[in-house]
């Protein structure tokens, strides 16, 4: 992939990451302000998981240009999130989303903006 394409992919991926962070905040808030069990029965989780798969595809390409981004980290955290969903454990889900996944995405949002610009 050429430099311009990598840069465009990085910009699009950063936008997706920022969107995912907002959606994680919304889900965490829903869990905190309600009994939170319905979080596992609505389509929002399916949509956000689809977007995480898209993110994983982009990260797989970007990590070749930016060594501070690793698909392995995302996979590990998504596996933990999936385990919490299978167990319908809203507190584990909230903790993984808020304290594991969100900080990783915030770090990537800062780091990824420089990918392809050198």
Q: Can you describe what each PLM-predicted range is?
A:
Residues 1-118:
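C-terminal-biased regions
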